[in-house]
Amino acid sequence: MQRMILFGGALREIVVRSGGLQAHYFLCTSRTRIKTHSQTRAASSTAHFSCYRLPHRTVLNVSGQDTSSFLQGIITNDMNLLGEDSLNAMYAHVLNVQGRTLYDIILYSLKGNPDGLNGVLLECDSTVQDSVMQLLKVYKIRRKVNLSVCPSLSLWALLPHSKEAVLGRPDVTTTDKVLVLEKDPRTELMGWRMITSAQDNPLDIVSACRLGNTEEYHRHRYEIGLPEGVGDLPPGEALPLEANLVYMQGISFSKGCYIGQELTARTHHTGVIRKRLMPVSLSAPAEKLNQGSALQTEGGKPAGKYRTGVDKLGLSLVRLAHAKETLQLKSSGDETVTVLASVPDWWPKTPQEK
């Protein structure tokens, strides 16, 4: 499956001049410290992955004989590919009728799963779990589909410590305790997704692994410029192509109709995207900034909007014409904050058609 770069000459110039971000295979940098908590120093030195519980994400089960066709008309990606050719995890957005993102989701195939569950597991932002369920029920109509929440399951992210770990699979010592273990479909720099029983400890399941806290996980996301959840992707506001959905393998342009498809397809075929969600470094802590604050150039020209962040890292929707400039915004205390955008290494470097 091919991909398409939809940005113009201005951003290509940034890629050449800046070289993009350095690949952040090593999480133990000056900006991202992995804390060992109760692990010993000896144990941490042999760990290949850091394991993060993701309480801000939740899991739903969608099952029944119409599951695939039901989701096919709702999500941006192609359900016909899930569960085929070893593709067992798929990223997608759910759009409104105007073509704006409502929810970002990851789907996990349960095909051949021996543990009683079937259909797919749907990962979404936990703060909008009820809204997602309500939306699915509205579109369900008379389809043979069952919907349920899964409070007995826990979702984990396994982030690699090295390039070798990125390319390798986590060593699972007790496979019967793992419901799902799949590469994060958005980018290899996000490691692996694992779903287990809420009662199980990942350290008893994965060898050469140590626990980290969720803030470290978010810091890594913002450092590499990967959006997740309603804070980064405000429902009804974010446009999927501006949010780099193509780069995260989250959309099919050949699957046919789905809700919100018209605007997305038209934008794709014109090839014009003037703004993109980009990682930014900040001169002040993100906690002092308001979501949606306007970005400006030093000359006062509109340059985009700030979204969210942690510490001095964050995401902003940046006008590509100004992406290589030093930008500014006002903090909640009316102080001027400097904003510098970067081009992630995991973005494609040459134009390709998906």
Swiss-Prot record:
It is found in: Mitochondrion. Residues 1-50 form a transit peptide. One of its GO terms (biological process) is iron-sulfur cluster assembly. The keyword Mitochondrion applies. GO terms for molecular function: transferase activity. Gene3D superfamilies: Probable tRNA modification gtpase trme, domain 1 (3.30.1360.120). Disruption phenotype: Morpholino knockdown of the protein results in profound anemia without affecting erythroid specification. The keyword Mitochondrion applies. Mitochondrial protein involved in the maturation of mitochondrial [4Fe-4S]-proteins in the late stage of the iron-sulfur cluster assembly pathway. Required for normal heme biosynthesis. Belongs to the GcvT family. CAF17/IBA57 subfamily. This is Iron-sulfur cluster assembly factor IBA57, mitochondrial.
